[in-house]
Regions:
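Amphipathic alpha-helical interface elements
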Residues: 1-47, 51-62, 66, 74-152
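Histidine-centered active-site/metal-ligand motif
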Residues: 69
Length: 152
């Protein structure tokens, strides 16, 4: 178990450093968690794995804190292979742009682009259909109008 715990700690440190750089923060994973908590529900809907990612981040941070601060934990079964795999996977997701915040950013950009394209299409449709003009007055109506002008 000692090797697994040490491997986990090293991978967690890599993830923490990446989160610090990614979020321009001194807090790393803790800041990522805080920003997830501050993210509005309307944005969370873009990420199918939002709740799982949030819970897993909190869990791996807890595991790391146990290993770092509790006496005798390095020789016990605190961390699992799944914990190690998840930390590595989340690191890779940040690197390849599929972490929750990047997914939200991409989805909102696509939404904005779609809205812009729809607006342009609407404007093009309006431009293709000229405004309906008033029907030209009949000869009789023009004659009556001219007579009225003559007497007024």
């Amino acid at each position: 178990m000692l090797t697994l715990n040490l491997d986990f700690q090293e991978e967690y440190k890599r993830l923490d450093r990446l989160c610090k750089d990614y979020l321009s923060s001194a807090e790393g994973v803790s800041e990522y968690i805080r920003q997830m908590e501050a993210t509005p529900w309307s944005n969370r809907r873009y990420v199918l794995t939002w709740e799982d990612d949030y819970k897993q981040l909190k869990h791996v941070r807890w595991v790391r804190n146990q290993l770092a601060h509790e006496v005798g934990t390095l020789n016990s079964d605190i961390c699992t292979e799944d914990d190690l795999d998840w930390v590595q996977s989340f690191y890779n997701r940040i690197m390849n742009g599929s972490d929750p915040f990047t997914v939200i950013r991409k989805a909102k950009a696509e939404e904005a682009l779609r809205a812009k394209q729809q607006e342009q299409a609407r404007k093009a449709t309006v431009a293709d259909h000229p405004k309906q003009t008033q029907p030209k007055p009949s000869l009789w109506d023009r004659l009556i109008a001219n007579i009225k002008k003559f007497f007024s």
